[in-house]
Amino acid sequence: MQYIVVTGGVISGLGKGTITSSIGHILKDSGFKVSSVKIDPYINYDAGTMNPYQHGEVFVLDDGSEVDLDLGNYERFMDINLSWKNNITTGKVYLEVIEKERHGDYLGKTVQIIPHITDEIKRRIRDVATSSKADFVLIEVGGTVGDIESMPFLEAVRQLKREENNVIFAHVTLVPEIGPTEEQKTKPTQHSVKALREIGIQPDIIFARSKNRLLEETKKRISLFTDVPEGGIISVYDVENVYLLPEVMVNEGFISYLSKLSGKEIKYRDSWKAYTENIKHPKDRVKIAIVGKYVDLHDAYISHKEAFSHVTGNTGIAVDIKWLDSEKVKDDQSMLSDVDAILIPGGFGYRGVEGKIAATRFALENHIPFLGICLGFQVAVIEIARDIIGLQNANSTEFDPATKYPVIDILPEQKGIKDLGGTMRLGSKKVLIKDGTLAKRIYGTDTIYERHRHRYEVNPNYISIIEKAGFVFSGTDEDGIRMEILEKKGDESFIATQYHSEFKSRPLNPSRVHLHLVQQALIYKKNKDIGEAVKLRSSV
């Protein structure tokens, strides 16, 4: 078993997570069993209560863990399912150590960063290695070398190499290109590696992030000042889509160099070849609006963005996302007039909800393909109740506790719960699909398992009323009590789900509802183009 530790220097946001994921994909595609660990140096226990503007999307695993979005990248690139063990935070580590101290596990010793905190970090890393039985365990250390929050984790992985001698260190740095000649500057990388060496870590590989491919002269200079052989300086230049990165790394000689370091023969099968060709050379394009309240930070909805990439890779239909602030859509639905489909993603809180309801109404009135996810499912129910059934001011008790028509209400088991972290209906749940429905045609089966993250549900008192209005709840939980899928009778282009199908979308197995939305968007676009052509001819 081999550990590969990925650290980052110079600045944050260089793409450590994507590089780690790409390493994992290359190894998995070469026949190795892989697992991964994301170390987040924040004191939060997990990502569950974080504002998306602070940290991007909260990703949900099968076991209900609310984790950093990088674990979503790991699952997608490596096609594996992870658990709570794969996300280590300062909060988890310190809480465990403090609880052990309270239990008397340290026998009266003074509890310190070294050895108690570092030992707990190593224990958690080794637990992943043991339980996964992986050939390679990838460890991404969040933050930037030099950050005070990361120091205990860097010390722990330094000790790990000293104790086991099966650790490869990979360091991600920035090579800026300055001036009109775009001269590649190596000084930031030199200083970053120097800072890493000062804490006892010598990188074995350097992933140099840059706008353009590294010049050979640049590689030689980095090698001279870092003691990393030129073959270990891997140029990671900008690509139009993250799924093209493994191909770049392979072409830059990463496989042969890693084979030498690990002593293992790595034979890459390139199972994504057709997939990446579709991404590079799509044959059609559609425009889909994502209407949310965190659209200024696209990472808040990264799993939807990636799900559309997966559809492109499998169909050759490229998706141009139009990011729309739901608060602005509330007052101006004309923003939606040029799109081929509308997606309403999940979310919490009242802000922006009326805009999402307005977008749903616009889709229904104009027969635009529609997909609602989680809160998007709930606002679809609210819109149907208000404007089709006529229940004026129908709402969710989340937004209006005193509403006359509470078509969405809190889950019974959620009543009385005060804590926010880890208390929702979370993780993979069984969904039963009814025969003769659009959902059955989309999935081709009567049972699926999808990931959830919600506190509210369709009020059972309104189910029959909604279905009498021309809609059908085509999916339920395994008890048939909780509504999971909503569709419009006789309409192939309207569907909403309580679950988050984007969390299980993979490059070679895209989310079925995202795939369906894109296919419907293309039909809508072509019909619209035909209609416009007919109008043009008739006016001549």
From Swiss-Prot:
Could you tell me what this protein is called?
CTP synthase
Q: Which residues bind CTP?
A: 12, 147-149, 185-190, 221
Summary of the function given for this chain in its UniProt record: Catalyzes the ATP-dependent amination of UTP to CTP with either L-glutamine or ammonia as the source of nitrogen. Regulates intracellular CTP levels through interactions with the four ribonucleotide triphosphates.
Catalyzed reaction equations: UTP + L-glutamine + ATP + H2O = CTP + L-glutamate + ADP + phosphate + 2 H(+); L-glutamine + H2O = L-glutamate + NH4(+); UTP + NH4(+) + ATP = CTP + ADP + phosphate + 2 H(+)
Miscellaneous remark of the record? CTPSs have evolved a hybrid strategy for distinguishing between UTP and CTP. The overlapping regions of the product feedback inhibitory and substrate sites recognize a common feature in both compounds, the triphosphate moiety. To differentiate isosteric substrate and product pyrimidine rings, an additional pocket far from the expected kinase/ligase catalytic site, specifically recognizes the cytosine and ribose portions of the product inhibitor.
Organism, per UniProt? Thermoplasma volcanium (strain ATCC 51530 / DSM 4299 / JCM 9571 / NBRC 15438 / GSS1)
In which family does this protein belong, per the annotation? Belongs to the CTP synthase family.
Question: Which HAMAP family did the record assign?
Answer: PyrG (MF_01227)
GO molecular function term, any single one = identical protein binding
- Enzyme Commission number: 6.3.4.2
Pathway given in the UniProt record: Pyrimidine metabolism; CTP biosynthesis via de novo pathway; CTP from UDP: step 2/2
Where Mg(2+) is bound, by residue? 70, 140
Recorded hits in CDD domains, A to Z, give:
CTPS_N, GATase1_CTP_Synthase
Q: List the active-site residues.
A: 374, 500, 502
Looking up Pfam families in the UniProt record yields: CTP_synth_N, GATase
Residue positions annotated to bind ATP are 13-18, 70
Self-association and partners:
Homotetramer.
| Name of encoding gene | pyrG
Annotated region (Amidoligase domain) at 1-264
Q: The Glutamine amidotransferase type-1 domain covers which part of the protein?
A: 294-527
